Regions:
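A general alpha-helix detector
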Residues: 1, 83, 87, 163, ...
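Core structural elements
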Residues: 451-458
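ATP-dependent adenylate-handling active sites, centered on carboxylate activation for C-N bond formation
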Residues: 8-14, 37, 90, 129-156, ...
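Polar, surface-exposed loop/tail segments
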Residues: 35-37, 98-102, 499-506, 518-528
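PAPS-dependent sulfotransferase catalytic core
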Residues: 511-570
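Cysteine-centered catalytic environments shared across enzyme families
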Residues: 1-330, 347, 514, 581
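Structural motif
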Residues: 93-98, 113, 168-175, 435-448, ...
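A Lys/Arg-rich helix-loop hairpin that forms a DNA/phosphate-binding surface
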Residues: 93-95, 472-474, 550-553
């Protein structure tokens, strides 16, 4: 995994400035760096390398094809590069052992159709020096980031927004996104970012820029298979689930550096641990964050069921309330945009611990809740389907309108704490998401995978891990596994009060009852606890600051009253206070 940057147009950043912009992302690629700068062509490509596969200097980027026509800058991993290389060997003379060269050869041979053959996470750009076409693409689920700015004259892209700003793009506030963040609690749900004019290429998309014509096209979307609800028995589903997951994990272990695992006390994480040890035949380094909290300390539970061998390679990062809050402002610098609170900071500290033990790659258990119906509110959607007698087939529903719930389906902030004029300006447009299925359950899962939960958490984890030069891999988001689980019959996801039914059935003989049977724990409970018991003074100071008082987004009197009630113990949702803190710190760092 690495950092990429590029520019195409009549007004390139000066070469020295372009290189400095690239090097704002040195943390993403501390092992090597390269640049292709051709002012006469109006093209610049830059790269910072984190060496994972083929550690030799032959993997240096930007990477040039044998005939010098194509130039690639690429971030990510193509897990099936070994198989693709065999398929391409008759057409391309390989000179390295990298997946980088395989990716470039695949594009040369198959053009944009190469994307259908790739298994992995990636964001890349290829410059065709003959046709003068810039081709850029992002993996199906948007695991790897791709931000860009295009003013109709010059196109600039990068792995992180900070690099775009360093290239000469002036930071400007996108008030519409600020409104959606405060009013609905949504962020990372669209192509727009908190910076006006800075966009993200959606997952499963590619773009072409030739001349001044920019075209973006989707090449993958779960909605493309909306009639494919699987008819499959529990027995056959178990076998296919096991086979797909084992193959995904096997591919995700392809690496020339050590691979570890982020471990929580949950079912998903422990499923990943079990299968990883089954596939590799050895115990691996695991990393957990341990919180000094009355509500939530997973390490106490993990310690109960790991065996002696596993415990020898289990690394616990002890975290206290003061340490995490002190890091909140630094996390803004890492993320470039508002982020998800104390859990994101805790993850960042865990990745720092992985760096201390020289484990360069970490597997993470993201995605099973979304693809197998694991969240509590999915039960409500499932029950709507049962009442109506639908199994997920049939005509699309159109769009889901989000009115009173935030991104985690918790009650959104009370509207009266927002400035009435600010609300009036932006509420007319509303906020809705494509709902391509007849099933309420599938549409809720689709929303979380394509728009809300997954894009958000993938951005958080990418930036949090890469600041310490750690590569996060997510085996549950192998697109084959995602498609299989998503289109399972609903009864294999939810039965009465049980969720992720198939997973629990598969793992029954492998995972301790203490893991399989426990209720899902919310990290938000820690945030609420610590805000009341540790952060009251800091929060009060920030909300009474001159800069915060000048913000036009708040009804300050109503907000002060609600915050006061929160500190007195009313309500368990602390997200609205986090919105105040996070947005204010971000505005000070990037906009003021």
């Amino acid at each position: 995994m690495c950092a990429i940057i590029g520019a195409l147009g009549e007004h390139l950043p000066p070469e020295e400035q372009f290189i400095k912009a690239r090097d704002t992302m040195t943390h993403r690629g501390p092992d090597d760096a390269g640049v292709y700068y051709a002012s006469k062509e109006g093209i610049a490509l830059g790269h910072r390398r984190l060496s994972i596969i083929d550690l030799s200097s032959l993997g240096k980027q930007p990477f040039v094809s044998n005939d010098k026509r194509f130039i690639l800058t690429y971030n990510g991993e193509i897990y099936n590069y070994v198989e693709l290389k065999k398929e391409l060997a008759a057409y391309y003379d390989f000179r390295t052992k990298t997946d980088t060269e395989v990716l470039l050869a695949a594009y040369i041979q198959w053009g944009e159709q190469c994307l259908q053959k790739l298994h992995g996470m990636f964001a890349f750009a290829i410059w065709d020096t003959k046709e003068k076409i810039l081709f850029c693409a992002r993996d199906r689920l948007g695991i790897k980031p791709f931000f860009y700015h295009y003013d109709g004259d010059t196109f600039v892209f990068a792995s992180e927004i900070k690099a775009l700003l360093a290239s000469g793009i002036r930071p400007a506030l996108n008030e519409r996104i600020v409104f959606d963040y405060l009013y609905y609690g949504f962020y990372d749900y669209s192509e727009e970012t908190f910076f006006d004019g800075v966009k993200t290429l959606p997952g499963g998309s590619f773009l072409k820029l030739q001349g001044k014509v920019l075209a973006i096209k989707k090449y993958w979307d779960l909605a493309y298979r909306r009639d494919d609800v699987e008819e499959i028995s529990m027995e056959n589903a178990e076998e296919k689930f096991k086979a797909l997951l084992a193959d995904s994990i096997k591919l995700h272990f392809r690496s020339d550096v050590p691979v570890g695992l982020g471990l929580s006390s949950g079912l998903d994480s422990n499923t990943l641990l079990y299968y990883s040890e089954e596939v590799t035949g050895h115990t691996m380094h695991t990393f957990s964050e341990c919180l000094a909290s009355n509500e939530y300390n997973e390490c106490l539970l993990i310690d109960e069921y790991l065996n002696k061998t596993q415990k020898k390679l289990w690394h616990r990062k002890a975290l206290d309330a003061d340490e995490l809050f002190a890091f909140a402002d630094e996390e803004n610098k890492i993320q470039d945009q508002p982020y998800g609170g104390i859990p994101t900071i805790a993850n960042t500290k865990r990745y720092e611990e992985a760096k201390n033990f020289d484990v360069k790659v970490l597997l993470e258990g993201e995605g099973l809740d979304e693809i197998l119906g694991g969240y509590r509110y999915y039960r409500d959607e499932y029950e709507k389907d049962v009442a109506r007698g639908t199994d997920g087939r049939g005509e699309k529903r159109g769009a889901q309108k989000m009115v009173s719930y935030g991104q985690d389906m918790t009650p959104a902030v009370e509207r009266n704490v927002l400035n009435a004029g600010f609300v009036t300006t932006y509420t007319d447009a509303g906020l809705s998401f494509k709902a391509p299925f007849r099933s309420h359950l599938l549409n809720a899962q689709y929303r979380d995978i394509m728009y809300t939960k997954m894009p958000r958490v993938l951005r958080f984890k990418d930036h949090a891990s890469m600041v310490y030069g750690r590569e996060v891999r997510v085996p549950f988001l192998d697109h084959r596994f995602v498609e299989f689980c998503f289109f399972l019959p609903p009864h294999l996801k939810i039965q009465k009060q049980t969720q992720k039914v198939l997973l629990r059935k598969v793992m029954k003989e492998y995972i301790p009852d203490i893991v399989r049977g426990r209720d899902k724990k919310a990290f938000g409970a820690v945030q609420t606890e610590w805000m009341r018991t540790h952060y009251r003074r800091e929060i009060s100071s920030l909300l009474s600051s001159r800069s915060f008082k000048k913000r036009p987004y708040w009804n300050h009197a109503a907000l002060a009253e609600k915050v006061g009630r929160f500190f007195e113990g009313e309500g368990g949702n602390s997200f609205f206070i986090w919105q105040c803190i996070n947005l204010e710190l971000w505005l000070r760092k990037f906009i003021d």
